[in-house]
Amino acid sequence: MRVASLFAALENAMKKLSLFRFAAPLLLVGALTACGSMMMQKAPATVADGVYVGANGMTLYTFDRDTMSSGKSVCNGPCATNWPPLMAGATDNPSGEWSIVTRDDGSRQWAFRGKPLYYWAKDARAGDRTGDGFNNAWRLARP
């Protein structure tokens, strides 16, 4: 009887090992796919006619008074009403030249090459660039 039970245990172990041999690669592929999708997040803006635009197609700008790579924006209050920030979601993860700064109110804003990005409230439609050079402090966001 001992030989028969050892044989049965060995046969059971081989079945489990065989199942693991096929399941392990599938689990690994699934895990790598999940990691890749987290790391390969879509950029928050695209390029149109040489400048960055938001998902709504509206032109994005940088503010000369923002200190590059400071991690914050100096355009708050009435400034942010006229120059709405390109907001980042709570789960957005920056990569490459994209970063996220924390605003005075605790909200998150996208930045490119360390400069926070903004829309101009007076741009009426996609493609407008009326904020470029405003007060000699606002610039088109370029790649």
Q: What do the predicted segments below correspond to?
A:
Residues 72-99, 136-141:
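A low-complexity, Ser/Thr/Gly/Pro-enriched, surface-exposed linker/loop concept
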